[in-house]
């Protein structure tokens, strides 16, 4: 796949890479709940000046955020990533120890980052 066929998706610090046409289809329901459990209260998307697709998600709580991320580790939870042709995924936010272990089993490069005390994100080993 040529690099020009990819666009970046940023979700409050998270970065996804995927095929732009598939991502556009995925985002057609923008403004509704992020997932079927409604873990996020709101999401919206736009194209930035440097041609990146920006997604913002607002969660009710850390528990809602964790529920959203844990959904990726369920059976067939990675289907959206495979559908979009993602080459890598970076997830930034509070994560649990079991998520760190599950991320190692994902069928594509999946990196977890956590908040550092100074507000930056640091990669989890």
Task: Report each predicted region and the residues it spans.
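Short S/T/G/P-rich N-terminal loop/turn motif that feeds into the first structured element of a domain
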Residues: 1-53, 60-70, 74, 82-125
